Design a protein with these regions (language model features):
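Active-site-proximal beta-strand elements of phosphoester/diester hydrolases
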Residues: 2-10, 104-111, 158-162
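Active-site environment of divalent metal-dependent phosphoester hydrolases
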Residues: 10-15, 36-39, 61-66, 113-115, ...
């Protein structure tokens, strides 16, 4: 079974549409942080209206929408997003699970135990083993830090699919993953930049190394 893993779309409709034009898969997994961006309602409805097997999990920013609490996202961002979503759309976000399994692959947003936990490609194996404790999967696919990576933690292959809508990378574009069973291919799609003229904060940009160092510092503060 071919599965496309699209993570951290962040309301970036041009990036999503560019990726969807390339996706050839039996299942599309939406890995969380779907709406926190310039076009939240339009992005969610594009995904929900697809004539495809689309399965969602929640991310921390999705949860912050319906919990109406301060999280990792700036408050003005969440106010912007909530104001553009219908009550039905917010209830849909509320219904999303933390994880999803397809065969021997487990999909989660950040880690299997927490949608906000920060671990990176350079986090010590010991910390990843703690986060993966009890996981009975051959492959774990995550996102959250917007940087693609592929590493082995014990018997578990750990893959970060990257970010479709807000990647931290040297090359602008959309980053995602395509799985065929437990085989994984990290993918990149060229796309137009989103319209951020109404976006309330500066649209974030960083290289993968800069972002990894930043998130690793946050990770140490969390531990």
């Amino acid at each position: 079974m071919r599965v496309a893993a699209l993570y951290d779309i962040h309301g970036n409709l041009p990036a999503l549409d560019a990726v969807l034009a390339e996706v050839d898969a039996d299942v599309v997994v939406i890995g969380g942080d779907t709406v926190a961006g310039p076009a939240p309602a339009e992005t969610l409805e594009r995904l929900r209206s697809l004539d495809a097997d689309v399965r969602f999990i929640r991310g921390n920013a999705d949860r912050e929408v319906y919990e109406e609490r301060q999280g990792l996202a700036p408050p003005e961002v969440m106010e912007f997003v909530r104001a553009r979503l219908s009550r039905e759309q917010i209830d849909f976000l509320r219904s999303l699970p933390l994880t999803l399994s397809i065969g021997r692959v487990l999909f989660c947003h950040a880690t299997p135990r927490d949608d906000e936990e920060i671990l990176t490609r350079i986090s010590p194996d010991e910390r990843w083993r703690e986060a993966l404790a009890g996981v009975d999967a051959e492959v774990v696919v995550c996102g959250h830090t917007h940087v693609q990576f592929d590493r082995q933690i014990g018997k578990v292959r750990l893959v970060n699919a990257g970010s479709v809508g807000m990647p931290y990378a040297e090359e602008p574009g959309a980053y995602w993953a395509l799985l065929d069973g437990t085989d994984v291919e990290l993918r990149y799609t060229r796309c137009q930049a989103p319209d951020v003229s109404e976006w309330p904060v500066e649209w974030p940009q960083a290289s993968d190394d800069e972002a990894t160092e930043f998130f690793e510092k946050l990770s140490r503060e969390q531990s």
